Curated annotation (Swiss-Prot):
Gene giving rise to this polypeptide: MT-CO2
Enzyme Commission no: 7.1.1.9
High-level lineage: Eukaryota, Metazoa, Chordata, Craniata, Vertebrata
Family: Belongs to the cytochrome c oxidase subunit 2 family.
CDD domains the record matches: CcO_II_C
Entry's cofactor comment: Binds a dinuclear copper A center per subunit.
Membrane topology, from the record: Multi-pass membrane protein
Protein known as: Cytochrome c oxidase subunit 2
One GO BP: ATP synthesis coupled electron transport
Organism, scientific name: Gazella spekei
Length: 227
């Protein structure tokens, strides 16, 4: 859950988000080292009085600044590709949920059940109870079992939307006429909030997403009560 004046990411709840945080730290360190080197070279150029006017080329230096960036790009690309393959890999999901974006709400359908579907609208500020979050609460939460692989099928009925839950490392476009998929797995129970992340009209800011991850036995009770 985000909090005011937050500068970093939300706490990771899924293996994918943990990998993304590690990759962010890895890349940030490389950027920091490059920036330090460039700043050091610029400071030397501004402060030194030495010149070498007779030198027309330097093969050694040109070789270094050709090979070194290539090595740096490889160090960034390899872990990035690894995470991309992890995000695309979906093997034998325990549950499949179909998500449809509308102007301006979400609808969900549990495809493993015969008649389990509902719409999820934002609760207006005037109807919030004490302790509830403004612009983030919904009338129907998406209840899912924790520690299980869940496949989300995401599309749209009208315009472009984007289904995003930052703490789980999820952000998938909802495109009319196209079915995208992503996978999620939560390591612990809790409420996880997200919002539509693609400008989709006047009420774009009023399309929250709330996932409630619970142990399997509580999910079974909830699904039985909804049928």
């Amino acid at each position: 859950m985000a909090y005011p004046m937050q500068l970093g990411f939300q706490d990771a709840t899924s293996p994918i988000m943990e990998e993304l945080l590690h990759f962010h730290d890895h890349t940030l360190m490389i950027v920091f080292l490059i920036s330090s080197l460039v700043l050091y070279v610029i400071s030397l150029m501004l402060t030194t009085k030495l010149t070498h006017t007779s030198t027309m080329d330097a093969q050694e230096v040109e070789t270094i600044w050709t090979i070194l960036p290539a090595i740096i790009l490889i160090l960034i690309a390899l872990p990035s590709l690894r995470i991309l393959y992890m995000m695309d890999e979906i093997n034998n999901p325990s549950l499949t949920v179909k998500t449809m974006g509308h102007q301006w709400y979400w609808s969900y359908e549990y495809t493993d059940y015969e008649d389990l579907s509902f719409d999820s609208y934002m609760i207006p500020t005037s109807e919030l109870k004490p302790g509830e979050l403004r612009l983030l609460e919904v009338d129907n939460r998406v209840v899912l079992p924790m520690e299980m692989t869940i496949r989300m099928l995401i599309s749209s009925e009208d315009v472009l939307h984007s289904w995003a839950v930052p703490s789980l490392g999820l952000k998938t476009d909802a495109i009319p006429g196209r079915l995208n998929q992503t996978t999620l797995m939560s390591a612990r129970p809790g409420l996880y909030y997200g919002q539509c992340s693609e400008i989709c009209g006047s009420n774009h800011s009023f399309m929250p997403i709330v996932l409630e991850l619970v142990p399997l036995k509580y999910f079974e009770k909830w699904s039985a009560s909804m049928l």
